[in-house]
C-alpha cells in the first residue's frame, strides 16, 4: 500500500503545477503576446538582406497606386503635383509565426524602419524627393505577407501640350520602380490595372478622365541588367469655365471692337485712337497667356493664335484707317478722282453693299436755300442793277466826268448819235449781258446807231456799272467753283465711306470665322 501512494503524490503535484502555468498563460494580456511575438520575430533579424531563403530567388512586390488629390498642374514648369498612397505587398519568410503560439495573434503593425522594404522610387520626380518621406508602419501577417501603404506628395514632370488651351487635355505619367535591384532580384507585379479613385477629392480645375497602370521592363544604357517598372498614365482634362469667363469672352469682345472701327465716322477723329486702344488691350491679354503657358517653341496655343491673328487684323485696320482718312479729306485742289474710282466706288460697289446715296434735292421755285442753281445766281444781282442810277454819288461824279466821257464816246463811236436814252435801258442791257454769261449763252452785242431794242437804243455803260458787273460776275464764278469743289469733296467722302463699309463686312466675317476656328478644333477633338 505504501508504494502506490508514494507514486501518486508526485503525479498529482505535476498536474497541479501544469494547471497553474496554464491558468497564468490564460490570464496574460494580449499585449504580452505581441511583445513575445516581437522578440520572436526580430531577434537576429537583418533588415538589410532580401527576404528570400536563396540568393537566386526573386522578391515579388505587388504595387498599386491610390490617388487622394490632384493638387496642381503647373503648365509653366511642366509639373504635376499629386497626393497619393503607395500600396505595396511582398512576402518575408523571416516574419512568419504560428498564431496559436502567440494567443492567436494573426497580424501586427511594426515600424517600417525595422523590416526590409523595397527601394521603390518615382523615376520622373521633379523636385528631388524620389522616395517616400513619411515612413508609416507596415502591416505584418502570420503567413509572412507584408503590406505597406505610405502616403506621399509627389511632383512629377509632365509634358504639357497647350495646343487647345484652355480646352486642353494632358497625358501625364508617374513611373515607379526599384532604384537598386534589377529584375533578377526584385520583380514588380501590377496590383490593379487602374488607379484607385475611391478616396479621390475632386479638383476645381482638372478632371481625371482615365488613369491606368502598365508594367514595363527596360534595359538602360548604364547597366546590363533589366529593370522593371510600373507606369501610371493619367489622362486629365482642364475645366475651362474659369478661362472662358476671364480670358476668352473678353478677348472676343475686344476683337469685336475692331469691327466698330470701320463703322465710326471719319469726321469724329477717334478712329486711330480706338484702333490703338484695341491693339493695346489685345497685347495685355497676350502677355497674360504667356505667363500661364509653358515657354516652348514647339506649339502655339489656339487662343494665342487667335489673339495674334486679331492683332494682325487690328494692325491692318490701323493702316486701312489711315488710308481711309486720307481719302476722306481729299479735295479737287490736291487730287483728281480717276474715272475708274468714280465708276467702281460710286456706282458698282454700293449696289452690292446695299448702300444708297440720297439724291441731291434742288430747292423748289419760290423757295430760298443755301445754294441756288447755277442759272439763277444773278437773280439778286439783276434786281440790284435795275434800280435807278441817279443816286447821289453818281450825280456828283456825273458833272465832273461828263466832258471826259463825251470825248471818249466820240472817239469810240463816231457814228453814234448822242441820245437821251434812259438809264433803265443801260441797266437792261447790262443785266441781259450778265445773264447771258451766267447761263452760258452769248452775251448780247452792243447795239449800234440806228439799232433799237423795243423803243430804246443801245447805249454805252458807265465805268462804275462795268466795275459792278465785273464784281457780280466774279462772285458768281466763285460760287460755281465752290459748288463744284463741294460736290467733289462729297464724292471723296462717299468713296471713303464705301471703303469703310467693305472692310466692315470683311472684319465681321473674319471675326466670325476666328471664333468658329477657336472652338471647332477642340469640339472635333472631343474636348468640349
From Swiss-Prot:
<keyword id="KW-0732">Signal</keyword>
<keyword id="KW-0770">Synapse</keyword>
<feature type="transmembrane region" description="Helical">
    <location>
        <begin position="240"/>
        <end position="264"/>
    </location>
</feature>
<feature type="topological domain" description="Cytoplasmic">
    <location>
        <begin position="328"/>
        <end position="501"/>
    </location>
</feature>
<feature type="compositionally biased region" description="Acidic residues">
    <location>
        <begin position="390"/>
        <end position="410"/>
    </location>
</feature>
<dbReference type="GO" id="GO:0034220">
    <property type="term" value="P:monoatomic ion transmembrane transport"/>
</dbReference>
<keyword id="KW-0813">Transport</keyword>
<dbReference type="InterPro" id="IPR006029">
    <property type="entry name" value="Neurotrans-gated_channel_TM"/>
</dbReference>
<feature type="topological domain" description="Extracellular">
    <location>
        <begin position="24"/>
        <end position="239"/>
    </location>
</feature>
<dbReference type="GO" id="GO:0005886">
    <property type="term" value="C:plasma membrane"/>
</dbReference>
<dbReference type="GO" id="GO:0035094">
    <property type="term" value="P:response to nicotine"/>
</dbReference>
<dbReference type="InterPro" id="IPR038050">
    <property type="entry name" value="Neuro_actylchol_rec"/>
</dbReference>
<dbReference type="GO" id="GO:0045211">
    <property type="term" value="C:postsynaptic membrane"/>
</dbReference>
<dbReference type="GO" id="GO:0004888">
    <property type="term" value="F:transmembrane signaling receptor activity"/>
</dbReference>
<feature type="disulfide bond">
    <location>
        <begin position="158"/>
        <end position="172"/>
    </location>
</feature>
<feature type="transmembrane region" description="Helical">
    <location>
        <begin position="306"/>
        <end position="327"/>
    </location>
</feature>
<keyword id="KW-0472">Membrane</keyword>
<dbReference type="Pfam" id="PF02931">
    <property type="entry name" value="Neur_chan_LBD"/>
</dbReference>
<dbReference type="InterPro" id="IPR006201">
    <property type="entry name" value="Neur_channel"/>
</dbReference>
<dbReference type="GO" id="GO:0043005">
    <property type="term" value="C:neuron projection"/>
</dbReference>
<keyword id="KW-1015">Disulfide bond</keyword>
<dbReference type="InterPro" id="IPR018000">
    <property type="entry name" value="Neurotransmitter_ion_chnl_CS"/>
</dbReference>
<dbReference type="GO" id="GO:0007274">
    <property type="term" value="P:neuromuscular synaptic transmission"/>
</dbReference>
<dbReference type="InterPro" id="IPR006202">
    <property type="entry name" value="Neur_chan_lig-bd"/>
</dbReference>
<keyword id="KW-1003">Cell membrane</keyword>
<dbReference type="GO" id="GO:0007271">
    <property type="term" value="P:synaptic transmission, cholinergic"/>
</dbReference>
<comment type="similarity">
    <text>Belongs to the ligand-gated ion channel (TC 1.A.9) family. Acetylcholine receptor (TC 1.A.9.1) subfamily. Alpha-2/CHRNA2 sub-subfamily.</text>
</comment>
<feature type="region of interest" description="Disordered">
    <location>
        <begin position="390"/>
        <end position="427"/>
    </location>
</feature>
<keyword id="KW-1071">Ligand-gated ion channel</keyword>
<protein>
    <recommendedName>
        <fullName>Neuronal acetylcholine receptor subunit alpha-2</fullName>
    </recommendedName>
</protein>
<dbReference type="GO" id="GO:0095500">
    <property type="term" value="P:acetylcholine receptor signaling pathway"/>
</dbReference>
<dbReference type="InterPro" id="IPR036719">
    <property type="entry name" value="Neuro-gated_channel_TM_sf"/>
</dbReference>
<keyword id="KW-0812">Transmembrane</keyword>
<dbReference type="InterPro" id="IPR036734">
    <property type="entry name" value="Neur_chan_lig-bd_sf"/>
</dbReference>
<comment type="function">
    <text>Component of neuronal acetylcholine receptors (nAChRs) that function as pentameric, ligand-gated cation channels with high calcium permeability among other activities. nAChRs are excitatory neurotrasnmitter receptors formed by a collection of nAChR subunits known to mediate synaptic transmission in the nervous system and the neuromuscular junction. Each nAchR subunit confers differential attributes to channel properties, including activation, deactivation and desensitization kinetics, pH sensitivity, cation permeability, and binding to allosteric modulators.</text>
</comment>
<feature type="glycosylation site" description="N-linked (GlcNAc...) asparagine">
    <location>
        <position position="104"/>
    </location>
</feature>
<keyword id="KW-0407">Ion channel</keyword>
<feature type="transmembrane region" description="Helical">
    <location>
        <begin position="272"/>
        <end position="290"/>
    </location>
</feature>
<keyword id="KW-0325">Glycoprotein</keyword>
<feature type="signal peptide">
    <location>
        <begin position="1"/>
        <end position="23"/>
    </location>
</feature>
<dbReference type="GO" id="GO:0005892">
    <property type="term" value="C:acetylcholine-gated channel complex"/>
</dbReference>
<feature type="transmembrane region" description="Helical">
    <location>
        <begin position="502"/>
        <end position="520"/>
    </location>
</feature>
Amino acid at each position: 500500500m505504501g508504494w502506490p501512494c508514494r507514486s501518486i503524490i508526485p503525479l498529482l503535484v505535476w498536474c497541479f503545477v501544469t494547471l497553474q502555468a496554464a491558468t497564468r498563460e490564460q490570464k496574460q494580456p494580449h499585449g504580452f503576446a505581441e511583445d513575445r511575438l516581437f522578440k520572436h520575430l526580430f531577434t537576429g533579424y537583418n533588415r538589410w538582406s532580401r527576404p528570400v531563403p536563396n540568393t537566386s530567388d526573386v522578391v515579388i512586390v505587388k504595387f498599386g497606386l491610390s490617388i487622394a488629390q490632384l493638387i496642381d498642374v503647373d503648365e509653366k514648369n511642366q509639373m504635376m503635383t499629386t497626393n497619393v498612397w503607395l500600396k505595396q505587398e511582398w512576402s518575408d519568410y523571416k516574419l512568419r509565426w504560428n498564431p496559436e503560439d502567440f494567443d492567436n495573434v494573426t497580424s501586427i503593425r511594426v515600424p517600417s524602419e525595422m523590416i526590409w522594404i523595397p527601394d521603390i522610387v518615382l523615376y520622373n520626380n521633379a523636385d528631388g524627393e524620389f522616395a517616400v518621406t513619411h515612413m508609416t508602419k507596415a502591416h505584418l501577417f502570420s503567413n509572412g505577407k507584408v503590406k505597406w501603404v505610405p502616403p506621399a506628395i509627389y511632383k512629377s514632370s509632365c509634358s504639357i501640350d497647350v495646343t487647345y488651351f484652355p480646352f486642353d487635355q494632358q497625358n501625364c505619367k508617374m513611373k515607379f520602380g526599384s532604384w537598386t535591384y534589377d529584375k533578377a532580384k526584385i520583380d514588380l507585379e501590377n496590383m490593379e490595372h487602374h488607379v484607385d479613385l475611391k478616396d479621390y477629392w475632386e479638383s476645381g480645375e482638372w478632371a481625371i478622365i482615365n488613369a491606368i497602370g502598365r508594367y514595363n521592363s527596360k534595359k538602360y544604357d548604364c547597366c546590363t541588367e533589366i529593370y522593371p517598372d510600373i507606369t501610371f498614365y493619367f489622362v486629365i482634362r482642364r475645366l475651362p469655365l474659369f478661362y472662358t469667363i476671364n480670358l476668352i469672352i473678353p478677348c472676343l469682345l475686344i476683337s469685336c471692337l475692331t469691327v466698330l472701327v470701320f463703322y465710326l465716322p471719319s469726321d469724329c477723329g477717334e478712329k486711330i485712337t480706338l484702333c490703338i486702344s484695341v491693339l493695346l488691350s489685345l497685347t495685355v491679354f497676350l502677355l497674360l497667356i504667356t505667363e500661364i503657358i509653358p515657354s516652348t517653341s514647339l506649339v502655339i496655343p489656339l487662343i494665342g493664335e487667335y489673339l495674334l491673328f486679331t492683332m494682325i487684323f487690328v494692325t491692318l485696320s490701323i493702316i486701312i484707317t489711315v488710308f481711309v482718312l486720307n481719302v476722306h479729306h481729299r479735295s479737287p485742289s490736291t487730287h483728281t478722282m480717276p474715272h475708274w474710282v468714280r465708276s467702281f466706288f460710286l456706282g458698282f460697289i454700293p449696289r452690292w453693299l446695299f448702300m444708297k446715296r440720297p439724291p441731291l434735292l434742288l430747292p423748289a421755285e419760290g423757295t430760298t436755300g443755301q445754294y441756288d442753281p447755277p442759272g439763277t445766281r444773278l437773280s439778286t444781282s439783276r434786281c440790284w442793277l435795275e434800280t435807278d442810277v441817279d443816286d447821289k454819288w453818281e450825280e456828283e461824279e456825273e458833272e465832273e466826268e461828263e466832258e471826259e466821257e463825251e470825248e471818249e464816246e466820240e472817239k469810240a463811236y463816231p457814228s453814234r448819235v448822242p441820245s437821251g436814252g434812259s438809264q433803265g435801258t443801260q441797266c437792261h442791257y447790262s443785266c441781259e449781258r450778265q445773264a447771258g454769261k451766267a447761263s452760258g449763252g452769248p452775251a448780247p452785242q452792243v447795239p449800234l446807231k440806228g439799232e433799237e431794242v423795243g423803243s430804246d437804243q443801245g447805249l454805252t455803260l458807265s465805268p462804275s456799272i462795268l466795275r459792278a458787273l465785273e464784281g457780280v460776275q466774279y462772285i458768281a464764278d466763285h460760287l460755281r467753283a465752290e459748288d463744284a469743289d463741294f460736290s467733289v469733296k462729297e464724292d471723296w467722302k462717299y468713296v471713303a465711306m464705301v471703303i469703310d463699309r467693305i472692310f466692315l463686312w470683311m472684319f465681321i466675317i473674319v471675326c466670325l470665322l476666328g471664333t468658329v476656328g477657336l472652338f471647332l478644333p477642340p469640339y472635333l477633338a472631343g474636348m468640349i
